[in-house]
Curated annotation (Swiss-Prot):
This is Protein naked cuticle homolog 2. It comes from Danio rerio. The lineage of its organism: Eukaryota, Metazoa, Chordata, Craniata, Vertebrata. Residues 389-409 have a biased composition (Basic residues). Belongs to the NKD family. Cell autonomous antagonist of both the canonical and non-canonical Wnt signaling pathways. The keyword Protease does not apply. One of its GO terms (cellular component) is cytoplasm. Residues 247-268 have a biased composition (Low complexity). A lipid is attached at residue 2 (N-myristoyl glycine). Expressed ubiquitously until 1 dpf, when expression becomes confined to the anterior CNS, with slight expression in the developing tail. GO terms for molecular function: calcium ion binding. It is found in: Cell membrane; Cytoplasm. Ca(2+) binds at residues 122, 124, 126, 128, 133.
Amino acid sequence: MGKLHSKHACKRRENPEGDSFVVNGFIAKRAAEEGERYGNNLKDYKNEELKDSQPTLLHCPLQVVLPPEKAEGCESFLQYLSPDDEERDAQKVTKRISLQDLECNVSLAEDNRQEWVFTLYDFDNSGKVTKEDMSSLMHTIYDVVDASVKHSCNSKRRSLRVKLSVTPEPAARRRDATHTERETSHLSQVEPVRSEEHRSADRRQSTHIRGQTEAHEGNHYCVDENTERRNHYLDLAGIENYTSRFDSSSPDADQDPPSRSSHSQSRPHSQEPETHVYQRRSQLMEPCVAPDPRLRTGPQLIRSRSPKGSSRYPGVIPNVTKTSKCHGHHQPISAGQDVYHLTQQSHTHAHTPSGLQHSHSRRIRSRAREQQALTPVKNTNATALVQRHEHHHHHEHHHHHHYHHYHQT
């Protein structure tokens, strides 16, 4: 077999996944030449081969490079084989930072610095930080920062400055006053502002709530007291309560018989003769006649007050309990009927929009008085005028008492 067959026979591959045997063609050619030179003398071949191969092995130094135990600098990855390179590059190695010297701050005397600030808020849920927590946390932060900044060491060298400041939680800031000097100095600047804000906010809130309650109570009390005082003096003067004419659903005006009875008892006796005059004149009035259609107010119904609310005299029960459908007129009145109820109804009729206005001229009043004096009570309009006239004099403090006797027959 020739050289070509033997060379191709050396390149034998059994399995693509492994067990492959490859021989370089240069080594095979050199082995064939040496075999032709020395023949079958294997001893001479081995010795000659070793003598010739010694200088070539010295030119290829072999060295096992192990990874560093802990990378503490950018230049620790480089391994220098020649002594000249090691001496030349040894000057470029920077200072190595030991963790024993590191407590809170690490600073190197260089211009370009990168500062990292970590602020923790009550990480152990107790409001206090011990020295063990600080030291373990500081070492952990330094290791993490050192490992994360290694990839940028080839571009430009920088010094790392790690600063850790521990600040208590705002809730613990008020209840715990035993901190370090740094925390105490920090609290001396922050605490007055926060306490003043909380104090002013609490003061505003309490003042607002207290002011609302006092305003509601004070307004209610003032309104009730002023209304009662005003009603009392109006009743003493013989004038109807102005608010009771329009607000019929008011509990102060409708559903307070004791107060009205007490007011009625305190009235002067000068009004009693007038009450008898009203009763005598009401006995002479005729029953209600069908009124003129022009004086009717379409959908308006006149409500009479309830017997409970309108009774000013204790023991006197009025007979009128239904609404009067005659505009300006009343049902027959008995001797024991409430006179103020009658005057208030007539005053309510006087304010209807279709009837005559409350403020008549003196000419119309005098004409109505002359008509009433000459003829009996026949015209319903005259009756309405007389009643309105009487009610008007009742509101004007009874300046015209002599007219009341003038109408009697």
